[in-house]
């Protein structure tokens, strides 16, 4: 179990982004699990019931928009906060994120600390150096416009 006791599911197909975001989240004491595509993300969300999901939008098999809709329409996962992580940075993309059920929105590239800040907004503060035991690495930065 992690120092915060909170689990974040990171749905991201880019290995560099997964390493950065998972590393910094673990540094702040969150347990991080990972999925490489929308289909795997949906399955892990349903089986593991994470406290929060960081959802890349441009992912294979099922994109992040559709995966979010599936999770928000499922009674078992609808209350899990989902933060969109996307290179789609237009105002219309932010609106679409909210329409499909995302609870937060971060435009890439984003500073690792911005990701942490956004996660903390939903889950509370973890402390630096309070790393959990899960493997992986990542950096995140908080921001919500």
Q: Model-predicted segments: where are they?
A:
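Active-site beta3 strand of CheY-like receiver
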Residues: 48-54, 59
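The feature encodes the CheY-like receiver
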Residues: 60, 78, 90, 108
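C-terminal output helix
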Residues: 110-119
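Two-component/phosphorelay signaling modules centered on CheY-like receiver
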Residues: 15-33
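Conserved acidic carboxylate
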Residues: 12
């Amino acid at each position: 179990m992690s120092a915060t006791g909170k689990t974040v599911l990171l749905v991201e197909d880019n290995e560099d982004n997964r390493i950065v975001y998972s590393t910094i989240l673990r540094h702040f004491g969150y347990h991080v699990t990972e999925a490489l595509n929308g289909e795997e993300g949906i399955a892990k969300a349903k089986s593991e019931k994470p406290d929060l999901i960081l959802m890349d939008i441009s992912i294979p098999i099922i994109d992040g928009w559709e995966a979010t809709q599936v999770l928000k329409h499922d009674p078992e996962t609808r209350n899990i906060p989902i933060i969109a992580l996307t290179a789609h940075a237009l105002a219309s993309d932010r609106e679409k994120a909210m329409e499909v059920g995302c609870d937060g929105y971060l435009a890439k590239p984003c500073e690792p600390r911005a990701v942490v800040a956004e996660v903390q907004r939903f889950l509370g503060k973890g402390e630096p150096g309070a790393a959990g035991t899960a493997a992986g690495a990542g950096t995140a930065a908080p921001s919500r416009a």
